[in-house]
Amino acid sequence: MQIILLDKVVNLGNLGEVVRVKDGYARNFLIPSGRARRATASAKQEFEAKRAELEKAAAAKLAESQTVGEKLAGTTCKLTQKAGVDGRLFGSVTNADIAEELTKTGFKVTKAQIRMPNGPIKVVGDSKVSVALHTDVLVEITVSVYGETA
């Protein structure tokens, strides 16, 4: 199925590009989430009429993400979990825990934006975690996990 991208999509294309994707990906994800539209003649004309306003909105979203990223860069997120004497946690620190803690400190971050390359944190100490605020804005933060003896 050919679609017009209404937003930048990672590994697919930028705003305004006409790309070919599998039908299920378009129907079940891209179109319902508002990131794309079927590439019909009328849709192309409508898109060209709205192109400037969509590009302006995308630029504003990017600028906002960059300002939040500058504030968030280098931030340390402190979490306390129950741990054994050897420093291993009973359970783990997930992206949901980190997102909740960042939200408490005043940043609007969802768990889907937290990138944990090594999976959940299972030991006490400091770990580096990335936060993807926008497709072009990736910020690295430090997560400090403190052990609480059970």
From Swiss-Prot:
Classification via Pfam families:
Ribosomal_L9_C, Ribosomal_L9_N
Give the molecular function GO annotations: rRNA binding; structural constituent of ribosome
Q: Which UniProt keywords apply?
A: Ribonucleoprotein, Ribosomal protein, RNA-binding, rRNA-binding
Q: Which GO terms describe its cellular component?
A: ribonucleoprotein complex; ribosome
Offer one example of a GO biological process linked to this entry: translation
Q: Which InterPro entries does the record associate with it? A: Ribosomal_bL9, Ribosomal_bL9/RNase_H1_N, Ribosomal_bL9_bac/chp, Ribosomal_bL9_C, Ribosomal_bL9_C_sf, Ribosomal_bL9_N, Ribosomal_bL9_N_sf
UniProt-listed PROSITE patterns: RIBOSOMAL_L9
Matching entries from NCBIfam families are given as: L9
Report the sequence similarity comment from the record.
Answer: Belongs to the bacterial ribosomal protein bL9 family.
Q: What is this protein called?
A: Large ribosomal subunit protein bL9
Q: Which organism is it from?
A: Albidiferax ferrireducens (strain ATCC BAA-621 / DSM 15236 / T118) (Rhodoferax ferrireducens)
> What is the gene called?
rplI
